């Protein structure tokens, strides 16, 4: 299979993977991917859950969607990911839809790629089957686009370490949206425990940053949705004062524009965006926001209601607002951004992501709360406090990556392997007895020692 990939795609693939001209550091980057599918959740080639969405996957929706983005952000480049069924559906509407998206690659420079298993491929398929899906799905993308085209990345939701290794070593693809940061008790699978900015994954677990050269998989692992750091603490969702507090509240439309309406939804989206493009940029030297905006949402109200909303007005205002507030921001494809990061970081040794976020006052983003995140190769650490009351910080997450980790086995026939999370010391979701918040100096001595080596300032004098 490795030889096949090289023979079929060698020349054009080399052309497609030239290093990006721009640089990572000093940049603000937005990546934006959209999913084209037939059924709501296509977990295997033959099995799907949820409604048939084919009536809202037509050239009309795609054209309106892409023209809205171009109007708001001329020069923007986005990533389109086709499901297995959408790649192979021979109805006229899907043939025309595929042809239209190919023109967007030529016109705008968009990326066209494949998504296996509706974000949840490993929850329903063996690793071997996922590799087959990746190979044949990517081959089909190349056939549709023509000219020896190969995408720089894959959209996958969650993807196991073995499959990430396969992408890098056999398919020659070194960027994958392979984790959904903080997702737990939402939809069809859990994968809580990673860091939220790019990293090289470990061969042990896709959520774990590689610890050394032998452990490193050369496939940059990207988050799928930027979420509000305070909302992310919730396991799934909960009702508070007759409102639904949702853990995925951030820059995606379902939890914002479609749930709250345009005005309030935009406020929540900009709060999550500014956390990275303002304070995060200063702390980390670059900033990244990413959104997954499924194509079905253009007219999803026809199937799912959404209070009659489609979110497109909000999308245009969000993109226009980003350009106005951060005029240096770039909207590039997921593959380009991942390769940009890969060109700068050769391993995880220098990773030291830090974020400080105060709530915007919308639902789970509580206005009196401040959260600080520290993320590196060895661990992630989250400290929470009531900043208005000037309360003492509490550790709500401490996940060690320097300890062994193991992914679940392949799902048994006809069954699902739902939880692929990496949790050890304390987890932000608070689902286990050991997850009770505690002061930094109440952690185990060896845990304090590890943190002190990285961030001595957290312990005072």
Predicted regions and their residues:
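Bacterial N-terminal signal peptides
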Residues: 1-7
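Boundary at the C-terminal end of the N-terminal hydrophobic targeting segment
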Residues: 10-14
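Active-site-adjacent pocket scaffolds in enzyme catalytic domains
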Residues: 16-19, 152-282, 358-363
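Active-site beta->alpha N-cap acidic-glycine motif
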Residues: 16-102, 254, 258-259, 285-290, ...
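Well-ordered, non-membrane alpha-helical segments in soluble/globular domains
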Residues: 51-67, 92-101, 128-138, 260-277, ...
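Metal-dependent polysaccharide deacetylase catalytic core of the NodB/CE4 family, i.e.
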Residues: 76, 81-158, 217-252, 283-302, ...
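Surface beta-strand/loop "capping" patches
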Residues: 342-386
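Acidic-aromatic substrate-binding/catalytic surfaces of carbohydrate-active enzymes
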Residues: 386-460
């Amino acid at each position: 299979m490795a030889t096949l990939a090289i023979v079929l795609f060698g020349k054009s693939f080399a052309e497609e993977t030239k290093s990006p001209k721009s640089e990572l550091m000093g940049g603000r980057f937005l990546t934006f991917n959209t999913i084209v599918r037939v059924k709501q959740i296509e977990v295997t080639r033959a099995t799907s859950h949820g409604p048939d969405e084919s009536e809202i996957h037509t050239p009309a929706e795609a054209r309106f969607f892409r023209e809205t983005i171009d109007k708001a952000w001329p020069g923007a480049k986005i990533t389109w990911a086709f499901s297995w069924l959408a790649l192979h559906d021979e109805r006229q509407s899907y043939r025309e839809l595929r042809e239209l998206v190919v023109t967007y690659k030529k016109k705008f420079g968009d990326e066209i790629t494949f998504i296996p298993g509706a974000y949840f491929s490993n929850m329903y398929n063996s690793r071997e089957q996922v590799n087959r899906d990746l190979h044949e799905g990517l081959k089909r993308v190349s056939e549709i686009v023509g000219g020896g085209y190969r995408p720089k990345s894959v959209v996958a939701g969650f993807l196991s370490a073995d499959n990430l290794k396969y992408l890098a070593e056999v398919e020659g693809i070194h960027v994958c949206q392979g984790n959904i940061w903080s997702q737990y008790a939402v939809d069809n699978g859990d994968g809580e425990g990673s860091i939220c900015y790019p990293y090289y994954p470990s061969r042990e677990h896709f959520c774990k940053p590689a610890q050394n050269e032998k452990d490193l998989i050369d496939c940059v692992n990207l988050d799928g949705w930027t979420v509000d750091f305070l909302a992310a603490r919730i396991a799934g969702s909960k009702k508070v004062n007759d409102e639904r507090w949702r853990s995925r509240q951030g820059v995606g439309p379902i939890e914002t524009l479609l749930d709250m309406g345009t005005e309030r939804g935009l406020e929540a989206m900009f709060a999550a965006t500014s956390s990275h493009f303002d304070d995060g940029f200063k702390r980390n030297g670059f900033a990244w926001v990413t959104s997954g905006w499924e194509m079905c949402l253009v007219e999803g109200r026809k199937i799912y209601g959404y209070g009659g909303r489609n979110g497109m007005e909000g999308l245009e205002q969000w993109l226009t607002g980003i350009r106005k507030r951060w005029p240096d921001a770039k909207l590039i494809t997921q593959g380009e951004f991942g390769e940009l990061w890969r060109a700068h970081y050769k391993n995880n040794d220098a990773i030291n992501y830090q974020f400080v976020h105060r709530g915007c006052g919308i639902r789970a983003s509580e206005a009196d709360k401040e959260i600080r995140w520290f993320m590196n190769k060895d661990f992630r650490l989250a400290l929470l406090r009531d900043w208005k009351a000037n309360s003492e910080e509490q550790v709500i997450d401490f996940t060690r990556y320097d300890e062994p980790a193991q992914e679940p086995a392949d799902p048994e026939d006809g069954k699902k392997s739902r939880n692929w999370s990496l949790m050890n010391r304390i987890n932000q979701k608070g689902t286990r007895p050991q997850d009770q918040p505690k002061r930094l100096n109440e952690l185990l001595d060896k845990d304090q020692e590890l943190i002190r080596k990285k961030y001595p300032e957290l312990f005072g004098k």
